[in-house]
Amino acid sequence: MSDVGQLFEENAALIALLNTSDRKRDSWPSIANSVEREGSAVRLLMHEIDPSANPLFDDEDPEDYENGCPTLFGDDEFGSPPRRRAELEQAREAARAELRTWADTGLDFISVLDERYPNRLRQVVDMPPFLFADGTMKQDELGVSVVGSRKATPDALAFARDTADMLVDEHLTVIAGLAAGIDAEAHRQTLADGGRTVAFIGTGITRQYPPQNRDLQREIGGRGLVLSQFWPGQPPTRYTFPMRNASMSGYGIATVVVQAGEHSGTRIQARQAQQHGRPVILRDQVAETTQWGRNLIGRPGVYIVSTVDDVRNALDDILNTDRIMQTALDQLIGAYAETR
């Protein structure tokens, strides 16, 4: 969606839906998927305000839904009650004001309806409905997550640096979470090598966490890209970091786990990568010393590595498989188009 005025209204409607949703019934990713499927947050919002006057689905495809026109937050064939309608309208007006404030202060808001939204992230079921960006967006870049313990050993830090070196040599983007330890080391080495790095943060875009990485975050924003899927002032919580890990997994083509303990948050990203169909490159020490690592051995898309050369070979295999699958997909799309 490239029309600025239309996108503004779509973004306002999306924010209104998010701010008035029942979080017990509707997660943000489910709302993002509903908006993506419908192709319009405005239509969803208007359907919430008056379902009978604003149907969502084409009458030619009634099998796509049951009970006529279900509302996002619950069915109501007689339309939303007046109080609910007023709440939605007020939320939309507040969202418009918020969007103007963000724009005036230089914050870059990118929703799922924005053509700049990362394509790979659109492919995962738990895609965030929006991102705040500081830096340069690249639509279809090939990136690899390098993640691991905050309290990393010298050996693990060296492995992270060498992996970042290799990724830069291969013209791949280095993705990490700006955490202390492995993540920060991968970011720093990439910048030192003149490569591109993307940081997914577990806070709002106006915050810096941990504080010691404040300068690093600014440098990444100036030379690469910092992304946040939270409201600008969101503080770090036990929930924001797993959500950030899921987005890192969806954004990249693979995840390299350098070091992690039995209860490390890194295991969440490894699990999410498996659910997303993204390969996991697991250092042998992690596979040998953790139960969750051992459980991944032998699974499709899981590579156990000992050296950075092993990581390179795994990525060669992953990229080659991606090319074969993309070629086959293009052929199928072409064949289908010829029948239309």
Task: Cite the ranges covered by each PLM segment.
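Glycine-biased, small-residue-rich flexible motifs in mid-sequence functional cores and linkers
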Residues: 1-10, 19-25, 105, 111-340
